[in-house]
Structures are given as C-alpha cells and as structure tokens.
Amino acid sequence: MTNEFLHFEKISRQTWQSLHRKTTPPLTEEELESIKSFNDQISLQDVTDIYLPLAHLIQIYKRTKEDLAFSKGIFLQRESKSQPFIIGVSGSVAVGKSTTSRLLQILLSRTFTDATVELVTTDGFLYPNQTLIEQGILNRKGFPESYDMEALLNFLDRIKNGQDVDIPVYSHEVYDIVPEEKQSVKAADFVIVEGINVFQNPQNDRLYITDFFDFSIYVDAGVDDIESWYLDRFLKMLSLAQNDPDSYYYRFTQMPIGEVEAFAHQVWISINLTNLQNYIEPTRNRAEVILHKSKNHEIDEIYLKK
C-alpha cells in the first residue's frame, strides 16, 4: 500500500473482529466448503472474524441509503422507489473473489431473512471467442476491450430500476460463452456483481460502472501469492479435465507436466499479471473496503475508506 491509500483507514484483523459482537456463523462447515473455490482456503473462524463484521457494515450502508432515499423523496414531494442494493466485488484472477461473493450471498440472505440476493459474474459479458477471433483480440481475452461494457452498463441500469434481466453464461470449462444458455437475474433486494473489471470505466467515459454500486469490495494480495494460487488452480483444473474432452483444459492433460507449467507461467506473465498491473490493481482505491490476504489466504488487513 502506498500514499495512494491515505484516504483509507487501515484496520488489523484483531481490531476488525472486535467491531462486531461474537455470534455463531449462520452456515455450516459443509456449506462453507461447498461455496469456496477449489484452490481457496477459508474457515468458519474467517467468517466470524472478517465476514460477519463486513455484513454488519453493509447493513449500515444499506440503512444509510434508505434514509437518504426517503429524505430525497420528501424533498421532491414524491414517494421514493425501492431499489436493489448493489455490491461490486473486484480483484485479480485467482485471488478469491468468487468465494467472497458466494459467502456474502449466503450471509446477506440470512442476515436479512426476508431478502433476496442475486449473484452475477461479469464473465458473462465477455465477447464470445468467435467475436474475439474476428476482432483479432483473442490473445487479449480478459482485458477491458474483450468485454461488452455497453451490455454490462445496460444490465446494471435495468437491475437498478428493478427489472428482471437475462444475461449470457460463461463456462470456464469450455473457456467460452455457452450458446443459448442464459442466467435469469430477478429483481432482488441485493445484487452482488463480481469480476476483475467491475471498477473499470467504459471506453466512452459517459457512465461509470461504479456509479451503480452502493458498496464495493476489492480482494487484494501480494503478486507472488496470486501467481502461486493461479498456477495451483490451473493444475487442479487439469486434474478435473482428464476424462472430459469437451473441457478447454483437456488438451493440456496430453502434454508433459513441465510444458504445462511453462505454458501456465507464460499465460500468467503475458496476460494475467499485465492485466492486474495495468487495469485491475489501479482501480482498487475505488472500493469502499479492501480485504488484503496473506500467503495462506487468510485476511490479515482491512482498509476502509474514510
């Protein structure tokens, strides 16, 4: 962290966990195991120490938003419309965004017992591989220009206005948008939007994605740690693809392990690290909260915007 983060309050794990009364996590060990990414590490102690205080903070932000909407309604002399509370979750590839997002979905649905919580990943807004090939940017997949940002902005606008929306589905197994398959996103009390690009600006700069967020989280870690987690995940994906010729990773199961490791390392250097340093990490100070992970995946520091 640099002077760029002077407008954040740095909070240790010990201090952060003391900001919320001790309660039993509202999920079981089995449920937690089922939602974590297969190369991630998280425990019920992490839920108690980190995520329950975070859910409480989100509750405060939601209440503040509702109070402001009510006051605006009085000022405008009209009834305020209920809108979903939208949470953006960003961070590098392989840093644990998906685990954080799925856990928040469970915690919010059980903290607000009558609330509905939708979870969306921005992978569905990647252009299909064929489109990327036609545009000559398949090697830039994951970079800002490989996303249909106008479609993402349109989705956020419709969700913000309480509409149901069908969006494309992306498969990491086939490494592409799944034809004819859609995720139906219903009007909800909470919508969590997770992806590497959720704090980035569209190229036309007419409207910022972050304008739609009521709360935002950046999952952070050291570059060397993220690289290690990425390579570990890549190799584990191979083990899952050994008997699945339809998987993108199947072709790598036919290669010597040394060649596979060299390929994965090159992908990390040329794509994921470049994307992280140039486009993802520079947006982290747009988050309300930064969760910093140590080498063993444990969150050791929290940065809260002042």
Curated annotation (Swiss-Prot):
GO annotation, biological process: coenzyme A biosynthetic process
Domain of life per record: Bacteria
Broad EC category: transferase
Subcellular location: Cytoplasm
Keywords for this protein: ATP-binding, Coenzyme A biosynthesis, Cytoplasm, Kinase, Nucleotide-binding, Transferase
EC number: 2.7.1.33
Major site of localization recorded for this protein: cytoplasm
A Pfam family of this chain: PRK
HAMAP family, A to Z: Pantothen_kinase_1
UniProt record similarity statement: Belongs to the prokaryotic pantothenate kinase family.
Protein name in UniProt: Pantothenate kinase
Biological source species: Streptococcus pneumoniae (strain Hungary19A-6)
